[in-house]
Amino acid sequence: MIKHNELVIGGVRTSSFPFKIIIKESRSFELSESKTQLLEHDGINGAILQSNSHRPSIKKVFTMQMINPSEDELNQFMALLVREKFWLESERLKTTKWWCYKIEATEAVEEASGLFIAKITFICHPTKFFKDTDTQTLTGNGVLRVQGSALAFPKITVVGQSASETSFTIGDQVIKLEKL
């Protein structure tokens, strides 16, 4: 019903429900803290830095207002929130989406007659992903451009014929093919 600021939770749009769902959130760009640790010891001045560039999961919190849902409709919406391993998209962010592991337990509380409010926390991978697919065509030996710093597992299709060795590079890694 309401498309402004809607969320897409595992392919299901909040606007697809027969009652109004208003998403309250400020547009934000999160970056979780690195797992690097400062180790302090009483016998030395300062600290030892134990580097770890990996990042923990992030929490995306949304407050949702549901207006005049029936009990069955509210149960259908709440059933959506038990999903695990799904994509989360926001209408406000046009180019990125998040891979979510799960949703923390939540409840919908009736604040006024017919107005239910739920605070929902999505536990997501710390890297945002692009919504669009990046298609690149290489001729001869070429370099596959990477976007961002996330681990990526691209689908690579090699077409053609070659009597000699062909190679291409992804980031710093060189992939060699004997014959096509």
Residue ranges and their predicted role:
Residues 1-39:
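Polar/acidic, low-complexity leader/linker segments enriched in S/T/G and N/D
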Residues 8, 63-106:
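Short, acidic/charged, Gly/Pro-enriched secondary-structure junctions
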Residues 39-69, 114-127:
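Oligomerization/assembly interface segments of phage tail-like spikes and tubes
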Residues 74-81, 117-118, 135-137:
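"Short basic amphipathic alpha-helical interaction patches in structured regions
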